[in-house]
């Protein structure tokens, strides 16, 4: 029994081996045939492509002939093109066009602005006479061609007593000076002193001399 079984398995092995050899041979033959066909087909395709390329090059060398259809197509293209619209960015002058020196110069005020600020400019010119506790160098100050007026904003770190109220805030320098009590007292005192000096030796002096003479009699 054992020998018969072994013989059967051996026969099966031989048959399977022979089948594998046949199949491999068939596959090799089929692959060779396919390669031959592919090579043949590739050669044909290369020839066709080369012919087409020659035809294209010859056509490109020929001169162009403009027809009515080309003119119509060009007109349609021109109609479809939208007109260029200038945007706001293009209308605005470029910042690069300005000179670098213009960045550091103040604006030149108009005549109306000069009239409005004329009194303030006079006060700045004679600022040495406004406050006795502040002294300035003697100089011939003139109104510059370019100037600007700004407001001082108090810092939040400052105490409330050092800040100005809404009533104290004025639109001009003259109004702020006239609204200050201390400055008004100083101005009145100086005005009286100047008036006494200017009136000395005139009618007041004559009246005083008359009164003195009457008392002597």
Swiss-Prot record:
Any one GO biological process: endonucleolytic cleavage in 5'-ETS of tricistronic rRNA transcript (SSU-rRNA, 5.8S rRNA, LSU-rRNA)
Keyword Acetylation annotated: yes
Ranges annotated as biased composition (Basic residues): 200-217
Keywords for this protein: Acetylation, Nucleus, Ribosome biogenesis, rRNA processing
Keyword Translocase on entry: no
Residues bearing PTM N-acetylmethionine: 1
One family name in Pfam for this protein: Fcf2
InterPro entries: Fcf2/DNTTIP2 (IPR039883), Fcf2_C (IPR014810)
Biased composition (Basic and acidic residues): 87-101
Region described as Disordered: 76-111, 193-217
GO cellular-component term (any): nucleolus
Localization of this protein: Nucleus, Nucleolus
Assembly with partners or alone: Interacts with FAF1.
Biological role: Essential protein involved in pre-rRNA processing and 40S ribosomal subunit assembly. Required for the early cleavage steps of 35S rRNA at the A(0), A(1), and A(2) sites.
Record family assignment: Belongs to the FCF2 family.
PANTHER family associated with the record: DEOXYNUCLEOTIDYLTRANSFERASE TERMINAL-INTERACTING PROTEIN 2
Name of the protein this chain belongs to: rRNA-processing protein FCF2
